[in-house]
Every structure is written in C-alpha cells, then in structure tokens.
Amino acid sequence: MARIGDGGDLLKCSFCGKSQKQVKKLIAGPGVYICDECIDLCNEIIEEELAEANDLGLVELPKPKEIFDFLDQYVIGQSSAKKSLAVAVYNHYKRIQVGEPSTKGREDAVEISKSNILLIGPTGCGKTYLAQTLAKMLNVPFAIADATALTEAGYVGEDVENILLKLIQAADYDVKKAETGIIYIDEVDKIARKSENPSITRDVSGEGVQQALLKILEGTTASVPPQGGRKHPHQEFIQIDTTNVLFIVGGAFAGLDRIIEARSGKQGLGFGAQLRSTTEKKAEPSFADVMPEDLMKFGLIPEFIGRLPIITSVENLDQEALVQILTKPRNALAKQYQRMFELDGVELEFTDDALEAVADQAILRGTGARGLRAIIEEVLLPVMFDVPSRDDIARVVVTREVVLKNVNPTLVPREAPARKPTRERREKSA
C-alpha cells in the first residue's frame, strides 16, 4: 500500500482518481499510481481483444492443399468440388485476415470483394457434408438453412433474416464471431422462377426469395429479430454485418442437365438434327459444363447468379465410391456399426460382396450416400434387437444374401471354455 504523502493527502490512482482508501490496493510506479480495479479492467480489455482476434481467425490459416487433404479424410471422391471449395474458402478468410487492419488509412488499398459459392449436384452426393466439414476444420460458426421454407417478407413462411438468426445462435449470440461464419442454403433450386419471363402475379417463394437474398449475399448490415420476427414483432433487433459471412448455396437442380445438353448442341429435332452414335448417347452432360445462361433458363435471376461467382459441382457416386464411403473415412458407416456391436462385446463383419450390394441398393433407390444408413439399419435390425440380450454370440457376419434376400446374418457362437477334468475322471483315466 502506498504511504500518505508529506502534505497529509491520500495518494490517488492516476487513472480513475480513486484514493487509496477507496480501493484494496494501490501500486506505485515512477510518478504514477494504479489501483487494483484499473488493473482488472485492463486485463478484461486485453482478454476481449485477444478473444476477438481469435474469433476473426487471426491465427495461421490452412493452405488450400491442407484444406483439401482434410476434406479427403471425411469425403470420398468429388475432387473437383473439394479443390474449388478449398481455394474459395482460403481466399475468403485470407481476405478477412489481411483486409481489415492493414488497409486502414491506405489510399492505394485494394478492396477485395466476397466470392460466394454455388454447389450443384444430385442428392446424397456430399454437398451439405462438404460445407459442414469445412466449418468444422476452420472452427467457425455454421448454419444450415432450407430455401424451401423461405418466402418474401409479408407472406406466410420464414423471412430470409431467419437464416442469419440460425448463424447467430450457432455462435452463442456472439455477433462478432457470427460475422465470420459459414451459411449453407440447401434446396436453392426450389426457389427458381416458375418461368423465364417475369410474371404479373407475385412469385413469393421463388423470385421474391431470390430478390430478398441479394443484399445479405452481397454484404449488408441486417436487422435480425432474436426470437423470430413474425411471432414477436416488438423486440430489439440484433445488427449483423454479412460482408464477411461466406454463403455456400446448394441444390440438386433436376432438369438442368437437359438445359446444358440443349445449349451444347448435343440434342436436336427435325431434319437438321445431328445424329449421335450409341456411345455418344450414353455420355450424359456433366454439371461441370454449366454456364450462367443455363442457370438463368432454369429460373435463377441474373442478379442472384452474379452474387455466386464460384460455381462448382458434385457428380453421382458409383458403386466403388459408395463402398469407399462405407469403409474409408474416419466416421465411415461400417466403422460406426462395428463400434456399436463392439460395445456389446460382439464383432461385426461385412463381406466385400455385402458392401457392394448395399451400394447397389443405394444406387437403385436414387438416394446416394444418404441412403446407405437406412439400408444398413434394415439389414441389421433383427440382430441389433437380439444381440444385446445374448452372451453366446461372438461374431455377426453380413453377406450379399443378407442384404438382397432378407436372410438373417450368420451368428458365430463363442467357443465354450474347456472343462477342467474332475477327480473321478482323473482316477478312471489312471
């Protein structure tokens, strides 16, 4: 504790002006004093700034190849989409890192615009999972929104601001953290304009939603009701800047392949139509060939397409890819079910032809990787019901017949422990 001066006056904190009697501790320096309360306040300020720096990703940003390799551990195939996403995400967060503090006050500073991503491909091919895995790697808030539930403001349905509310909730209402998050908008093909020509009647769940999304995609300060706007109209709004929010927009875009085929001249009618050989007919147009004009014909408005400069696609998964999805990734389905049986002290084995049969069933159902779990659940349901109640089973073997013909899996019993010879038996043998 600092001592009382010669004049009899109490010493005071040089920062807040409180006397030594008003505080617990007063620390003296060369001509200055600081109290314990001001020290605590300084610590809080430093901790907040450090936390904010970490939330904004001001740590070492993984390089595109590192992002690609991380995605490879969880997502099978789709190399083109993974490369596009890795580069886009790296550039986006590099823009956030470098763009804010270093360019302030510089007249020659170049302002880098945001590049959102459009991800096209059939259902069950990993669009949502790719976005989830990216957010997991970067440790940023992540929210998934369904475009089919959205309507234009003033109509029954969800407002586009509800998408931002999900992101804020994912960040535990830390707005600064949410402002550097990732939002995945699924089923965006369902908000396509009903016809190529503008209609007199309002298209509140199609073109109207596209128009409403434009501002938040581009970057704006949006007012978000913390409890949803329509049920609680009288509430304070949360202000969130979407300039640094990365939007990944995905959809199956059924029928887009025919538009691509027609544009590329692979399809024709009449006497002037170009005939194709059998092999050419088998080669279907790829979503990788999509052009902005194809998306406009599908029903997306030019302004909406313009805010999604990066267009990439995922392709249908073949049998080999689906078998790899079942076995290779860290969280592969086969590994998950083997672990569940292991908890009951039972070994679960899938034969190679059984895995191929599961993959074939998923292709037949048209559900892609998303349908694999449902098929395995159907196959394993009887044994998952019985096994926990029995202690005589050592191993369960699933074969092709089990998957295709609804046969029960093979149950391998435990070996009975060797019986010790009794005294009577030993005497007889002697």
From Swiss-Prot:
Domain ClpX-type ZB, first and last residues per copy: 1-54
SUPFAM superfamilies, per the entry: Glucocorticoid receptor-like (DNA-binding domain), P-loop containing nucleoside triphosphate hydrolases
Annotated binding of ATP, by residue: P122, T123, G124, C125, G126, K127, T128, Y129
GO BP term (any one): cell division
PROSITE patterns (UniProt xref): CLPX_ZB (PS51902)
Subunit structure: Component of the ClpX-ClpP complex. Forms a hexameric ring that, in the presence of ATP, binds to fourteen ClpP subunits assembled into a disk-like structure with a central cavity, resembling the structure of eukaryotic proteasomes.
Family affiliation: Belongs to the ClpX chaperone family.
Protein task: ATP-dependent specificity component of the Clp protease. It directs the protease to specific substrates. Can perform chaperone functions in the absence of ClpP.
Protein name: ATP-dependent Clp protease ATP-binding subunit ClpX
Gene name linked to the record: clpX
